[in-house]
Each structure stands twice: as structure tokens, then as C-alpha cells.
């Protein structure tokens, strides 16, 4: 029985297929030799091989360029400890200048020193634990602070004037007390208050000019003006009642 099968492909299609079989993919390179006798062996470019091994391609694409953005614990501790040292530096310098650093300390002074060490330790733990939060907040605050750098001159003058007034009052109070021990305590307290307050005034006046001087005076005048008006109204009401006692009846 003869096979009457006839191919529907034209001779031109058969030539194109032969050319395609011998063409080389420029991206993949020449096909390696394929041994069909090995069990489970598949051509490296087959669809089944690509489907079964997608992880290798993903690893090759993402094996480079991956970095860890988290800060090491040692660097975080160093930054937090440095910030605490900078905060305590003015007090240390003042005590060293007065030659009162660890001299003539009694029970009260050592208790205060131990409490201050405890506060610094807790602050170090807090700054280390919330490092990401306060570092981002400080970064945003510094950027906003530097945008208003033109106000720094007037802010510095106002904070300097505040320091001069406070120092004058501290000298008067220390000389009035007379006792060296109480005078030293008054000086240390006044210096600490002056340092913290002057820094806060400088920052506030730089960010919003007049917030600590003009606005404060306006609010004080408005408050006292309101109190005066209330007092005048009460006096006028009492005077009218005394002049017209019949109206009350």
C-alpha cells in the first residue's frame, strides 16, 4: 500500500527552515552539544530548563548592588555619647574655670553628681534606642534653621543681651548672699539656666523673629491691659451702684 502523503510546504519554506536550524543566536551563542542518551538531560535553552531554574537568573540579576543601610550599633552609640558630651561641655568648662571640679564635695554634691550621671545614662539609652527618630528630626530642624540664617545676627544679639542681664543679676545675688558655698551654687545654677535659655532664645528668634521679645512684650501688655480694664469696669459698676441705690431695690 503506497503512502499518498504529500507535503503542503513549498520548497521555499523548506529552505527557510534549513537556514533557521543552522543560524546562531547572537545573544546566547552557539548551541552546545546535546547528548540525548543521558537521562534527564535537556538542552540548556529549552523552555523547560528556563521554567525550572528561575531563581538562578534572579540571583544573578540581584547579586550585586545590595547594601545594608542600617547604621552599626557602635556608630549609633558614639554619636549619642558625643551629643551628651557636647551638652555637658559648658558646665564642665565652667567648673574647671572656677577650679571647683570635684573639690570640697559633700554628701549633697555627690548625691547631685550621681543623679546627674544617672540622667546622662538614661539619656544615652534613650538616644541610642530612638536614634532614627531623633536624627531625622534634627536633620529637618537644621535644614529649616539654616533657611533663616539671616535672622541669626539679631538672635545672637538678643541672646547676648539676655546673658548680660542674667550675669548682672547673678553677681548681685552672689555678693548679697556672701556665703561662698551658696554663692557657688547660685553661680552654677545661674550659668546652667543662662546657657540653656540663651540657646533656646537664639533658636526661637532665628526661626521666628520676635517670638521671644516682641511677641512676649505684646502678650504681657495685652494681659495687663485686660486686667486693668477688668478692674476699671468693676470699680465703675460699684460706683454706679453706690450712686443709684434705688435701682438695686
UniProtKB/Swiss-Prot annotation:
Annotated segments matching region Disordered: 1-40
Keywords recorded for this protein, A-Z: Membrane, Transmembrane, Transmembrane helix, Vacuole
GO terms under cellular component: cytoplasm; nuclear envelope; vacuolar membrane
Compositional bias ranges of the Basic and acidic residues kind: 19-30
Main localization category: membrane
UniProt-listed GO biological process terms: meiotic drive
Protein family: Belongs to the WTF family.
Function: Acts as a suppressor component of the dual wtf meiotic drive system, and can suppress but not confer meiotic drive by compatible poisons. Wtf meiotic drive systems promote unequal transmission of alleles from the parental zygote to progeny spores by encoding a poison and an antidote from the same locus; the poison is trans-acting and forms toxic aggregates in all spores within an ascus, wherease the antidote is spore-specific and targets aggregates for degradation by the vacuole.
Protein name: Meiotic drive suppressor wtf25
Amino acid at each position: 500500500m503506497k503512502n499518498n502523503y504529500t507535503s503542503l510546504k513549498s520548497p521555499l519554506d523548506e529552505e527557510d527552515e534549513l537556514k533557521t536550524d543552522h543560524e546562531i543566536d547572537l545573544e546566547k551563542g552557539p548551541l552546545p552539544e546535546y547528548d540525548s542518551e543521558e537521562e534527564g538531560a535537556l538542552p540548556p535553552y529549552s523552555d523547560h530548563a528556563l521554567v525550572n531554574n528561575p531563581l538562578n537568573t534572579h540571583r544573578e540579576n540581584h547579586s550585586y548592588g545590595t547594601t545594608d543601610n542600617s547604621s552599626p550599633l557602635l556608630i549609633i552609640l558614639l554619636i549619642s555619647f558625643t551629643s551628651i558630651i557636647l551638652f555637658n561641655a559648658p558646665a564642665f568648662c565652667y567648673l574647671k574655670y572656677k577650679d571647683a571640679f570635684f573639690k570640697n564635695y559633700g554628701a549633697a554634691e555627690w548625691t547631685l553628681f550621681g543623679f546627674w550621671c544617672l540622667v546622662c545614662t538614661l539619656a544615652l539609652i534613650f538616644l541610642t534606642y530612638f536614634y532614627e527618630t531623633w536624627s531625622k528630626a534634627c536633620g529637618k530642624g537644621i535644614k529649616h534653621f539654616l533657611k533663616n540664617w539671616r535672622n541669626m545676627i539679631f538672635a545672637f544679639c538678643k541672646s547676648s543681651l539676655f546673658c548680660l542681664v542674667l550675669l548682672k543679676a547673678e553677681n548681685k545675688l552672689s555678693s548679697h548672699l556672701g556665703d561662698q558655698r551658696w554663692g557657688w551654687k547660685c553661680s552654677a545654677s545661674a550659668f546652667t539656666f543662662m546657657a540653656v535659655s540663651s540657646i533656646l532664645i537664639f533658636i526661637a528668634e532665628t526661626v521666628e523673629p520676635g517670638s521671644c521679645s516682641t511677641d512676649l512684650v505684646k502678650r504681657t501688655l495685652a494681659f495687663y491691659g485686660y486686667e486693668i480694664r477688668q478692674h476699671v469696669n468693676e470699680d465703675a459698676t460699684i460706683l454706679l451702684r453706690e450712686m443709684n441705690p434705688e435701682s438695686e431695690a
